[in-house]
Amino acid sequence: MQHTSSDTLSENSIKLLQITDTHLFASDEGSLLSVKTLQSFQAVVEQVMARHVEFDYLLATGDISQDHSAASYQRFADGIAPLEKACFWLPGNHDYKPNMSSVLPSPQITTPEQVELNAHWQLILLDSQVVGVPHGRLSDQQLLMLEHHLQASPEKNTLILLHHHPLLVGSAWLDQHTLKDAEAFWQIVERFPMVKGIVCGHVHQDMNVMHKGIRVMATPSTCVQFKPKSDDFALDTVSPGWRELTLHANGEITTQVQRLASGSFLPDFTSSGY
């Protein structure tokens, strides 16, 4: 499935806004580790609007829901409506794809494999979900699809989206739940120098590193944050956030993480897991 943006293909840079790991519930009182996830999600959307953040597309990189309910996905769809931008989403390990599909067709949300953003850039969206387990894996079909789109547009700078982290983050408990076939993934992408960036969710923290000449980014959750470099499960004191990216015509990526005010939506630090 290929998606061409409905806007005139711009010759200029593309601005993207990534939100991830919203962990929503059917109930508006649903909480994860004592953080009411609908409220924290809404606070992020409200702050994006209050700051007049300019962006062309919204990226939602999985774990939209915590309870698998159709209502939780509708809450997400309703929540992003004020942003008035097209949203591309993909599943995480907590998502239930039949209920994700229940809100489609949507005026904002689509689930393409590939998006031509403009004359210079494409997105490729991968499904790394393995039903019933927290780690990720790319099926042979997903790997073939990735290779196909890279071969079909060898001149386009490419940003790849998936839920699970394709690089270890240095937290033993989280790195058990990484992308299990990362080697097969990297064997494909490193053959294509136009792959400029990879964006994921899952780890509930900021990561921005270069690997094999490719920028690899993970992004804070809109709710609970995991403490970096912690061997055992641990929560961080930093606030929920989002990522802003600019894809430049020359293939460069500039990006920054933004957060809610310090002290916003603090979790239960006595929790030993979830």
From Swiss-Prot:
Binds 2 Fe(2+) ions per subunit. It catalyses: 3',5'-cyclic AMP + H2O = AMP + H(+). One of its GO terms (molecular function) is 3',5'-cyclic-AMP phosphodiesterase activity. Transmembrane segments: none annotated. AMP binds at residues 23, 63, 93-94, 204. Its EC number is 3.1.4.53. Disruption phenotype: Mutants show increased levels of cellular cAMP. Keywords: cAMP, Hydrolase, Iron, Metal-binding, Nucleotide-binding. SUPFAM superfamilies: Metallo-dependent phosphatases. It holds the Pfam family Metallophos. InterPro entries: Calcineurin-like_PHP_ApaH (IPR004843), cAMP_phosphodiest_CpdA (IPR046379), CNP_phosphodiesterase-III (IPR050884), GpdQ/CpdA-like (IPR026575), Metallo-depent_PP-like (IPR029052). Fe cation 2 binds at residues 63, 93, 163, 202. Its cofactor is Fe(2+). PANTHER family: CYCLIC NUCLEOTIDE PHOSPHODIESTERASE CBUA0032-RELATED, PHOSPHOHYDROLASE. Belongs to the cyclic nucleotide phosphodiesterase class-III family. This is 3',5'-cyclic adenosine monophosphate phosphodiesterase CpdA. It comes from Vibrio vulnificus (strain CMCP6).
